[in-house]
Structures are given as C-alpha cells and as structure tokens.
Amino acid sequence: MSLSPKHTTPFSVSDILSPIEETYKKFGGVMDGAPPGLGAPLGAAAYRAPPSGPSSQAAAVAAGMQPPHAMAGHNAAAAAAAAAAAAAAAATYHMPPGVSQFPHSAMGSYCNGGLGNMGELPAYTDGMRGGAAAAATGWYGANTDPRYSSISRFMGPSAGVNVAGMGSLTGIADAAKSLAPLHAAAPRRKRRVLFSQAQVYELERRFKQQKYLSAPEREHLASMIHLTPTQVKIWFQNHRYKMKRQAKDKAAQQLQQEGGLGPPPPPPPPSPRRVAVPVLVKDGKPCQNGAGTPTPGQGGQQPQAPTPAPELEELSPSPPALHGPGGGLAALDAATGDYGGGVLGANLLYGRTW
C-alpha cells in the first residue's frame, strides 16, 4: 500500500503553498523598492514558511500530518505574511525614509508564532519623533549652531506642542503689557473718607456759627477734630450747597402745599353800567326834562305836570273860527289846543305826520 494518494486533491501542500509563493513574489518587488534599512530584513523576517517541494511533502506524509492540520498551520503563516506585507506597504507610503515602525527581531518572532517579545515594541510616538527628526535632518541639514544644542537640552518630548502653546501665551502676555500703561495712566478715584459722629457734630456746630472760615480758622478746626484743612474746606463747601438746595426744595414744597388748598377765587366781574335812557313821553304826555327816571337830585320832588312847548303851540294854532266872543268856545279851544298840541308834539318827535 503506497503512502501517497493516487489522485491529488486541492488540499495538498503544494496547492496551498503555491498561492503564498505568488503573493511573496508579488510583494517582493515592493520590498525591492523599499528603503535599504526596511526591505531586506523585514522581508526575510516576515516570511518564515517551510520550503515547498517533493521532499517536504514526503516528510509531511511520513510524519503523519493530516491535510486539515497542515492547512490550518499554513493559513496562519499566510495571514502573518499578508499582515507583514501590508505593514511594509504602509511604511513605504506613510513613513519617512530610513524609519521602521517595528523592530525586525520582534516582527520575526511574531511571524514565527512567538508572542514573548511583544513587550519589546517601542512606543509609536518615539518612532514618529525619530522619523520627524531624521526627515528634518535630511531636508534642512544638520545645524551647527551651539545655541540650538543648548536649547534642545531643556526641551521635553512634546517640545513642538509646548512651543506652539507658548507662542499663543506670549502673544497674550505682550497684549497685557501693552495695556498696562493705559491702566496706570487712568486716574484712580480716591477712597471716600468717613467722618466720625464727633467730627460731624463739631463741623455742624461750627457751620451754624460761621458758614465761611478763613484759612487760620480752618486749620485750627482741623487740628481740633484731627482732620486736614482740605477736608474741612471741602466739607464746608458741600454743606453750604446742601443747605441751599434744602432751602430751595422747602420753599417749592410750601408753595405747592399752599396751592393745594384751593385756587384763589376769581375777581368778581364788573357790575354792568346803568345808562339813563331819556323817556320823552310818559302816559301820553311828554316829560319836561326828557328823562323817564328821576335824577338823584329830583328823587324827593313830585313830578310836575307837562306843559306844551311854545314851538309846538306855534306849529299848531287853533282855527280862527273858534276864537269868537263866546267864552265856552275859547275854553274848548284851549283844551283842544292843549290835547292836540300834545299829540302833535309826540307824533313829530317819533317822525310821523298825520
């Protein structure tokens, strides 16, 4: 009975290793274009697969390895190789030249299945800091100024960030320094001095006696109540103004109170003037003085009988036929003349003619 199967299945060792070899060859070109310090060691350490060939197959069959176990082991190796290739590609496109993200020994141990050296992996920031320094050195060249070397001794790992932050703080400090003279130039308001009750009492007592003090009197009063002459002078000025304002407010209040009792009564209207209207005819008879109301001088006298005016008698003479030898006719003529004269005189006065 032969140990090798008659018909090969797709799960044989050669079928599994052939795509891995193609993948390795494909990424081999990328590794050849990688930096010198990264390509060869990483490529050698990343791929640790057993050699493929008839001898390896025979050894596997002789050892009694079943196809599923072999497939699982080689799948792990393939996954490790793919991860290493992806890391190499990422390092090629994202990392500066000459910088390796992981040590080759640690990567080799990981690909071989050992996890004991994972603690030896350096921090990511250390690699980035070293890469940035290497890139800066390659781009700008080494700086020989001794001042920069002395400064670099005092700068910590996060020097770039701190310098940026200190730049903003420096700007704020400069602005504060520029504003400082403005605040110093502004005049400061003096603190208000509070007098004691004894001092106020003495000042008020002296103010009642004398509202204006001379310089010697002011100095003497200030020495008595333990104040400065300037304070006494200012207090007297303020108190004089206060008294004047209080007097003015009091006078205005009194006027308001007096006006609140009631408005003053309006002056009585002037009495209508009595104008004497002359009455020419009263009870059908003309008046003598032409006034209907007696004058003050005539108040106690009896009104006299009206007599016909001579001019009216001349205007209305009695007819000649009536003047005869008979006395009765003469009396009648006289009476008729009197009555007719009175009526005629009234008609003439009112502008009517009969």
UniProtKB/Swiss-Prot annotation:
Residues 290-304 have a biased composition (Low complexity). Gene3D superfamilies: Homeodomain-like. It is found in: Nucleus. Keywords: Developmental protein, DNA-binding, Homeobox, Nucleus. The keyword Chloroplast does not apply. Residues 262-272 have a biased composition (Pro residues). GO terms for molecular function: DNA binding; DNA-binding transcription factor activity, RNA polymerase II-specific. It holds the Pfam family Homeodomain. Its main location: nucleus. In the embryo it is detected in the posterior hypothalamus and later in the head. In the adult it is detected only in testis. Residues 188-247 bind DNA. One of its GO terms (cellular component) is nucleus. Residues 245-329 are annotated as: Disordered. Belongs to the NK-2 homeobox family. Probable transcription factor. This is Homeobox protein Nkx-2.4. It comes from Mus musculus (Mouse). The gene is Nkx2-4.
